[in-house]
């Protein structure tokens, strides 16, 4: 897997990879990450992939991160509570 672009963003670390005839967009926020795969034949090139990172898309991504964080925190609390019962 090869890094082809690191996209500057004030909140997220956004990296675009090229691998196996696909572009992979990896968006990281703290300890969570989301990945999106796009077949390289479905886009004209890297500029088109980067253009997909609209404000609307990134707001949706942020909302998903919030939900992921809640889910993970709940799972952690549940596990900790179960350990204390033993």
Task: Please describe what each predicted stretch is.
Residues 32-54:
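A hydrophobic, small-residue-rich beta->alpha segment in the mid-to-C-terminal subdomain
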Residues 48-86:
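Acidic, low-complexity intrinsically disordered segments
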Residues 2-39:
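N-terminal acidic leader/helix
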Residues 4-7, 43, 49, 66:
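Extended aliphatic helical segments
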């Amino acid at each position: 897997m090869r890094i082809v672009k690191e996209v500057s963003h004030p909140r997220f670390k956004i990296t675009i990879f090229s691998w196996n005839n696909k572009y992979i967009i990896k968006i990281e926020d703290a300890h969570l990450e989301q990945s999106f795969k796009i077949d390289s034949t479905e886009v004209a090139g890297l500029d088109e992939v980067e253009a997909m990172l609209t404000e609307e898309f990134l707001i949706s991504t942020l909302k998903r991160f919030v939900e992921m964080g809640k889910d993970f925190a709940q799972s952690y609390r549940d596990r900790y509570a179960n350990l204390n019962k033993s």
